[in-house]
């Protein structure tokens, strides 16, 4: 009977290539494995290859250094009673190709009206000075070391407080008296009123070499350009992530009489997680075009890094995301650092920690930093203090 079953099983296996056995168990006292000669040869060859790899000589890596026919214009901000800062002047894209002549600059955002809608991690630093733009700017400079201040004239918006251009000029005068750093003067974003406001603000700050923000194709950019020419200011040329739009606007401003040394471009900053790759693409292409000789794009660039706070990950309270006290500044820092590595020269920011860290990082981009003597970090541990447990 058993032989019949075995014979039947063998017939079933005649045309079978493989057998899969489920829930198989084998109890043995001793197991011997025999390797086929081909398997032994494969093992020996593998060992030989590994020995050959380990024996390869080390090769020194030298980063590729390119030379470019063009360079970025240098823009000076701050004259008269102001300290001066310089933007641009680059002759290469990467720091290892050639360090920047001027470090990137961070400017503190200040507003002409209280901003209770700011995220708490920012508001808690400035809640005591929000009623007065002069005090707000003074605190940014004296307590947090701001090298520049951006005064946003939000209150002039028709749907906000509808402050007149003359009232805006008084706010500018107050901030000018409060601090001695260069100013960026921004409007409310209203295309009809902003040129009038910037014109009056430029007059109030005559000779102080401020940056008027901004001129774009949706408003009277000619009026903004004339205000800059008449009162010795520079102009922020704002385009929305479009290289061709940026070229067109720059060309129009140059036709109005501005020089490349009077223009700073803002290609628009999309926040981390909200389209930052578009900004990386446009900013890098813009800088490369400038270095390759496109004179319409040979100006420094600005980043509205404050846009990072519009990301819900920066301010929304959610326990699994971690505390906003850290998350918000980190979101702003990473957004700014990404723009810095892409070629941006000046950053508008909100949080004191973000401003400080990005400024410190920017200083490493300069020739002075790269040629300075650095300490031997291998000796960073000088003493150990421990207790046995």
Curated annotation (Swiss-Prot):
Pfam families associated with the record: CdhD
Protein name: Acetyl-CoA decarbonylase/synthase complex subunit delta
Superkingdom: Archaea
Lineage: Archaea, Methanobacteriati, Methanobacteriota, Methanomada group, Methanobacteria
PANTHER family tied to this protein: ACETYL-COA DECARBONYLASE_SYNTHASE COMPLEX SUBUNIT DELTA, PTHR36214
Subunit structure: Heterodimer of delta and gamma chains. The ACDS complex is made up of alpha, epsilon, beta, gamma and delta chains with a probable stoichiometry of (alpha(2)epsilon(2))(4)-beta(8)-(gamma(1)delta(1))(8).
Family named by the database record: Belongs to the CdhD family.
NCBIfam families: cdhD (TIGR00381), PRK04452.1-1 (NF003375), PRK04452.1-4 (NF003378)
Function comment: Part of a complex that catalyzes the reversible cleavage of acetyl-CoA, allowing autotrophic growth from CO(2). Probably maintains the overall quaternary structure of the ACDS complex.
SUPFAM superfamilies membership: Dihydropteroate synthetase-like
A Gene Ontology BP annotation from the UniProt entry: one-carbon metabolic process
